[in-house]
């Protein structure tokens, strides 16, 4: 899922008990992302200069912002008597990581819905309106319940069904719809001498991400996650049979239209990682697996 998120700039939500590596996985994402293009780097530098924070040593690297869950609305989205950019603007062309997502103020999280769609945030004051860029990739992490141990085989969870429901209701459906990849991180058995499973190293994974991003840039001028509706219709076409299959799947899983569109974007990224032009049934099926289980 991390590779897919990096390849298509998709929003990603990790869910799992404490100590399963959710934060560690999120911190690995910047290492998979391609460096900033020159025009992107200039935009990032201009934003950071407003806050008197220009880390020239990180010039080609994408921003990675990790605000605390106690952050206020102005700190996260921007504001003040003289409007200043918030964390979502400082994460422009980079990653915004929100750990313990349900612990953030719900009203603050709801404000994220607009920039997640438009790529900018508008701050209104009595005399004027200020528009800041906010084209960021959202990565978030959360526990499955207030105590964090729901579903653990040890039976440690002490939460009642009502407590679990109230905890999950802190995140609205429209906000969750804007997250492309929902991944449950399970706890693995602890071993003093764990067996290392062969897998893809970071360098080769980053190379695949760079190749996929280059395909997207040449084809449509942006990452798949940022495709608008006309771009989606043009670059995410399906065969008649697969389109019918997807419509049936969306009806059975009661997916919203926005969820279906984001599913198509993920399928487009899966095809790009395989370096194929067309979206196939297996790409759609895999993308469906990353929708929330509750749907």
Language-model segments: which ranges?
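Conserved alpha-helical scaffold flanking the Walker A/P-loop in AAA+ ATPase domains
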Residues: 3, 57-96, 128-129
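Walker B catalytic acidic pair
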Residues: 93, 99-101, 111
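Pre-Walker A (Motif I) flank of P-loop NTPase domains
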Residues: 8-13, 92-94
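Basic, amphipathic alpha-helical bundle interface domains used for macromolecular binding and assembly
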Residues: 83, 106-295
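Conserved inter-motif catalytic segment of the P-loop NTP-binding fold
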Residues: 40-72, 79-80, 227-237, 257, ...
């Amino acid at each position: 899922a991390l590779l897919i998120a990096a390849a298509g700039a998709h929003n990603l939500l990790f869910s799992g008990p404490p100590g399963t590596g959710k934060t560690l996985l999120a911190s690995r994402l910047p290492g998979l992302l391609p460096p900033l293009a020159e025009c992107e780097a200039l935009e990032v530098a201009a934003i950071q200069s407003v806050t008197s924070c220009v880390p020239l040593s990180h010039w080609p690297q994408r921003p990675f912002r990790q605000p605390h869950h106690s952050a206020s609305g102005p700190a996260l989205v921007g504001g003040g008597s003289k409007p200043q950019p918030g964390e979502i603007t400082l994460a422009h062309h980079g990653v915004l990581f929100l750990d313990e997502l349900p612990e953030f103020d719900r009203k603050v999280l709801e404000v994220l819905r607009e920039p997640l769609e438009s790529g900018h945030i508008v701050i209104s004051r009595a005399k004027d309106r200020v528009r800041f860029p906010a084209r960021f990739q959202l990565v978030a992490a959360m526990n499955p319940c207030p105590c964090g141990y729901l579903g653990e085989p040890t039976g440690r969870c002490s939460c009642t069904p009502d407590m679990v429901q109230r905890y999950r209701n802190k995140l609205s459906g429209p906000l969750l719809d804007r997250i492309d990849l929902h991944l449950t991180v399970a706890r693995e058995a602890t071993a003093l001498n764990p067996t290392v499973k062969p897998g893809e190293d970071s360098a080769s994974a980053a190379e695949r991400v760079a190749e996929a991003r280059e395909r997207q840039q040449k084809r449509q001028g942006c990452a798949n996650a940022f495709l608008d509706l006309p771009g989606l219709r043009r670059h995410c076409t399906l065969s008649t049979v697969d389109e019918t299959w997807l419509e049936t799947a969306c009806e059975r899983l009661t997916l919203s239209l926005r969820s279906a569109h984001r599913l198509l974007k993920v399928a487009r990224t899966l095809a790009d990682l395989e370096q194929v032009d067309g979206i196939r049934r297996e790409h759609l099926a895999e993308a469906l697996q990353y929708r929330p289980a509750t749907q």
